[in-house]
Amino acid sequence: MSVTKEQVIEFISNMTVLELSQFIKELEEKFGVSAAAPAVGMMMAAPTAASAEAEAEEKTEFDVILKEAGANKIAVIKVVRALTGLGLKEAKDKVDGAPSTLKEGVSKEDAEEAKKQLTEAGATVEVK
């Protein structure tokens, strides 16, 4: 009985990270190859605008930065409290100390939602 490619893929997809790491090491030893990318090619390639755009697209963690509170500071403080779970004094200190980072390492959806809420309250916000 021969094993199909689909069965191999299914088997590998059910492996844990540790098992997969050991599996890769065994394959490297058996075939005398390395799964690591060659460093020479990376050093020769100069960064271009296209690669910078691709890197920006691949980014998965974003920071929400309050640039300034705007005219309606009270509404912005309320939104900051709701987004961060901070107390009134801490939220006010964040708003008064702008520019300040409100959220770090959040998903793009969460960052955009926070930006939307803060902008609606009158704040100037940046997502990095």
From Swiss-Prot:
GO terms for cellular component: cytosolic large ribosomal subunit. One of its GO terms (molecular function) is mRNA binding. GO terms for biological process: translation. It comes from the Bacteria. Keywords: Ribonucleoprotein, Ribosomal protein. CDD domains: Ribosomal_L7_L12. Pfam families: Ribosomal_L12, Ribosomal_L12_N. Transmembrane segments: none annotated. Residues 105-118 have a biased composition (Basic and acidic residues). InterPro entries: Ribosomal_bL12, Ribosomal_bL12_C, Ribosomal_bL12_C/ClpS-like, Ribosomal_bL12_oligo, Ribosomal_bL12_oligo_N_sf. Residues 97-128 are annotated as: Disordered. Belongs to the bacterial ribosomal protein bL12 family. Forms part of the ribosomal stalk which helps the ribosome interact with GTP-bound translation factors. Is thus essential for accurate translation. Homodimer. Part of the ribosomal stalk of the 50S ribosomal subunit. Forms a multimeric L10(L12)X complex, where L10 forms an elongated spine to which 2 to 4 L12 dimers bind in a sequential fashion. Binds GTP-bound translation factors. PANTHER family: 39S RIBOSOMAL PROTEIN L12, LARGE RIBOSOMAL SUBUNIT PROTEIN BL12M. HAMAP family: Ribosomal_bL12. This is Large ribosomal subunit protein bL12. It comes from Lawsonia intracellularis (strain PHE/MN1-00). The gene is rplL.
